[in-house]
Amino acid sequence: MGIRAIVVDTAGTTTDLNFIQDVLFPYSVKALPDFLEQNQHNVLVENCICDTKDIALEPEADLARVTEILQQWVNEDRKATPLKTLQGLIWKQGYAHGEFKGHIFPDFIEAVKRFSAQNLRIYSFSSGSVDAQKLLFSHSDGGDLTEMFNGHFDTRTGNKLDKQAYCNILNTISLSPKQVLFVSDVIEELKAADAAGMMTCQMVRDSKQRTGEFHKISSFDELLIE
């Protein structure tokens, strides 16, 4: 049957975790107050504000309080969909203004070209929004990589630690579990994908990283698909 599609995690796998934590997250925290003030009547932003109030169980929260909640969620690395949507919108402005480029490990830049040439389908699955993933890969160190991807998945597909999220991906891409390889640095994500029947591979870029009973690689150069 063979592998026909590869699903990659982003932070820690295709992208340096430090770029997310030290560049993108602080940028979104700093930009949130002005962004919400200027865009609060935009329908998408308005929906995110309402969803934030609902999740926080603070229906009467004013804009300043909503901003405070969202900034706290960034610091807690909460995977709340309204936060991830707003971060994507904020990062879009940052990329457009040349504030930063999307960090992608060089070995993945080469690998994604190789996989594409092999007619393998390539997807990303991240707690960051689909829009944020597209921005990362379109403004990358290696140029625009988006044309090599067949799709992207985020928290709307499900929690990355839940088996059901990976079942949902399989249903969406219409492949059997053994035709899909999931690559991540996080053991709990690999366990969830494995429970859904997917093939798995752990990316270990740091010697201090927790490892499990999964096939391990330290670079996409080592991932050869027949």
Swiss-Prot record:
The positions making up the signal sequence are none
| Origin superkingdom | Bacteria
The reaction(s) catalysed by this protein are: 5-methylsulfanyl-2,3-dioxopentyl phosphate + H2O = 1,2-dihydroxy-5-(methylsulfanyl)pent-1-en-3-one + phosphate
Q: Any binding details for the cofactor?
A: Binds 1 Mg(2+) ion per subunit.
Cofactor(s) of this protein: Mg(2+)
User: SUPFAM superfamilies, alphabetically?
Assistant: HAD-like
List, alphabetically, the Pfam families matched.
Hydrolase
Q: Which InterPro entries match?
A: Enolase-ppase_E1, HAD-like_sf, HAD-SF_hydro_IA, HAD_sf
A GO biological-process term: L-methionine salvage from methylthioadenosine
What's a single GO MF annotation on this record? magnesium ion binding
Its Enzyme Commission number(s) read 3.1.3.77
User: Which keywords accompany this UniProt record?
Assistant: Amino-acid biosynthesis, Hydrolase, Magnesium, Metal-binding, Methionine biosynthesis
Q: In which pathway does it act?
A: Amino-acid biosynthesis; L-methionine biosynthesis via salvage pathway; L-methionine from S-methyl-5-thio-alpha-D-ribose 1-phosphate: step 3/6; Amino-acid biosynthesis; L-methionine biosynthesis via salvage pathway; L-methionine from S-methyl-5-thio-alpha-D-ribose 1-phosphate: step 4/6
Tell me the subunit arrangement.
Monomer.
- State the HAMAP family in the record: Salvage_MtnC
Family, according to the entry, reads as follows:
Belongs to the HAD-like hydrolase superfamily. MasA/MtnC family.
Sum up the protein's function in the record's words. Bifunctional enzyme that catalyzes the enolization of 2,3-diketo-5-methylthiopentyl-1-phosphate (DK-MTP-1-P) into the intermediate 2-hydroxy-3-keto-5-methylthiopentenyl-1-phosphate (HK-MTPenyl-1-P), which is then dephosphorylated to form the acireductone 1,2-dihydroxy-3-keto-5-methylthiopentene (DHK-MTPene).
Q: Which PANTHER family match?
A: ENOLASE-PHOSPHATASE E1 (PTHR20371:SF1)
Q: What is this protein called?
A: Enolase-phosphatase E1
Print the organism lineage.
Bacteria, Pseudomonadati, Pseudomonadota, Gammaproteobacteria, Alteromonadales
